[in-house]
Amino acid sequence: MKTFVICSGGLDSVSLAHKVAVEKTLAGLISFDYGQRHKKELDFARACAQRLDVRHMIIDIRAVGEGLAGSALTDEIDVPNGHYAEDTMRITVVPNRNAIMLAIAFGVAAAQNADAVATAVHGGDHFIYPDCRPGFIEAFQAMQAQALDGYAKIALYAPYVNLSKANIVSDGVRHRTPFEATWSCYKGGKHHCGRCGTCVERREAFDLAGVTDPTTYEDAAFWREAVARKAG
């Protein structure tokens, strides 16, 4: 199955790219520049494409991103520290981000005679991000079936949608994902901050999976405090 992977350069999407490269036919990686503060993630997506020897498209939607104001990922708003499950992390929502990216990726896949588009949304995202939930995935697939009716049949492949990030780490190990060559931090500094929601979730996932985390964090201990606070 000829499949394009939406790849941010993060742990989840890079692991998915390696999975697709082994289990299907990887047609290429599609990344998006939407004005995100952690734009350095795109360098990791580019490196992934080079490593897997496939085409990499970086699609510039910064003009769209300018209209999606109010998120800590795009505006000069402090990225909150803490676990993803905390309500404070809602400030990191970019409205309709996945729907916009998927719609573009489906268009590319149809034009390139591909069979599927893969996205790395996962169970850990459900609390904060509505466009990462199973209902959204099912509805988007149904919408695209109508949008491309008579032109192309493109499947939406979301193998992690009901899995945890720890499950993704385990899957990444099976498919030899080089975790050190992935970027998760929303703050986009020299190293992972270790304090934002995605850093905390990343560190916790390695711990739960029983896999050594190769990541350098500016604050390597904070995640335990954040996880304990979440637990109660």
Curated annotation (Swiss-Prot):
Mind telling me which InterPro entries this protein's record contains? QueC, Rossmann-like_a/b/a_fold
Describe how the cofactor binds: Binds 1 zinc ion per subunit.
A Gene Ontology biological process term: queuosine biosynthetic process
Give the keywords, sorted.
ATP-binding, Ligase, Metal-binding, Nucleotide-binding, Queuosine biosynthesis, Zinc
From which residue to which does the signal peptide run?
none
Q: Which residues bind ATP?
A: 7-17
- Function according to Swiss-Prot or TrEMBL: Catalyzes the ATP-dependent conversion of 7-carboxy-7-deazaguanine (CDG) to 7-cyano-7-deazaguanine (preQ(0)).
Its family? Belongs to the QueC family.
- The name of this protein is 7-cyano-7-deazaguanine synthase
